[in-house]
Amino acid sequence: MSTSKALTDCIKSFLSACDVPLEKSTYLETGLLKGDSVQLALDLNFKKIISIDIDKSAIDNANQRFKNDVLDSRVLLVQGDSQKKIKEIFDQSINIIYLDAHNNDVDEETIAPLENEIKFLLDNVNEKQLIIIDDYIKIKNSYLFENNDKSWKSKLSYKKLKEIISYKGLNIFEIFSSSGTNCHLLLTKNKNFRIEKILFLRNLINRFISIKFYYKKNYFRFMFKKLIIFLL
């Protein structure tokens, strides 16, 4: 889970709208890395935290880092391909689902599980469950990475993602981080959920700041080259 205040505020707001206290809610994530997101979920006071990662060494390290919480059954660490494991673990009691397993150093065939994860979840989630997709700004601009076959960002195009989510009757929000280099896509079947006004205004500001991402990725140079090629 990201440390973005905008995102954590959205999570709290969603749970409140669903009348589910944080301390009684369950958080599921795909993509563990060093376990910082598990720590954040603990700090937010989730009752149960589940993390799936294909990297055994990451799971082993996290088992040591969170050994007391694992022993107390507050944290469950699952090793395996997230697009398969999520089908085994998912149930209606999970409130927040954070998808961040895209990219790993273990198996190139599984670096982009997002498409299968989303397809499964959208067929099974209820109105009290929120799906969060990390790195959405990179997916939205996947054409910047289309020449890199080994990058997860080239495996799921923005067009493909839009097709997957467009017919599901979803309430959709794009939440930008204050860093200007990331944003999250939030999906829910809860039509009554709305972002609070202050958060909405803050998100507009963060959207403007996201120009940093395009600057870092040489977006303007990229578009200029495309224009020159077109004119020639």
Where are the language model's segments positioned?
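A short alpha-helical cap/connector motif
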Residues: 1-96, 102-232
